[in-house]
Structure formats: structure tokens, C-alpha cells
Curated annotation (Swiss-Prot):
To M.jannaschii MJ0661. This is Uncharacterized protein HP_0274. It comes from Helicobacter pylori (strain ATCC 700392 / 26695) (Campylobacter pylori). InterPro entries: Puta_zinc/iron-chelating_dom. It holds the Pfam family CxxCxxCC. It comes from the Bacteria.
Amino acid sequence: MQDFDFSFNPKACEGCGAKCCVGESGYIFLNIQEMQQISAFLKLELEEFSQKYVKKVGYKFSLLEKDAKELGLACVFLDLETKKCQIYSVRPKQCQTFPFWEGVKTFSKEQKEAFCQSCPGITQKTKETKVR
């Protein structure tokens, strides 16, 4: 994608063990439409889905996390045995657009290096290959 100084190979996701779905606590934000899509996919009423899988963070909604033992915390929809997303076809936009998040553009050099090292699909571009 343009304006990012890294590229992403989505094929790397197949063997990485869902590193983007586990680790330190974080937020997986979703909007009402995404909540409706996921609840329909799971064949749950929106209210039941919200009570079981969503927390409110200020004025936003986020998916809950679960204990992933030595991996830290995981998205509530990550199957810990297969390391696959149980709602992949209807996952939130935040998950669909990883790693191309606007906030990444403001990372310090050290943060960006750590971010790139955390995902086998991310490759930092050199100055010669940077796309504008």
C-alpha cells in the first residue's frame, strides 16, 4: 500500500501461528454493522453476541480477549489449537486491514522495527524501493 514504508505478504499468515491475534492486551474495535454481521454469522441475536463477546471502551466497542497461556492474551475468536480465526470471513475491518493501520505511520523507528519483526509477512522497504 502507498505511504507505508513496508510491504505485506498475506501468504505468510498461513504458517505464522496468528501472531497478530495474540500477545499483550489490546483492542479489536468494531462498529455496529460489523457486530451485526458477526452475530448473524454465529446465528446469535445481537444482544446475546454483545454480552458474550464485546466490551465497551469509551464510546467504542471491542472484542473480548481470552487467556492464551504462554502466548499472553488472544482474540476471543482465535482457535488456540488450530491458530485460525473462527470468524475469518466476517472479521472486523481492523483485522482485514492489518498491518496497514494509520497509527503505524507515526511509530518511532524502534516501534516500527519491533512491529515489522512481530509479523513474518511484513518486510520493511528500503529507501530505493519505497512506494509513494
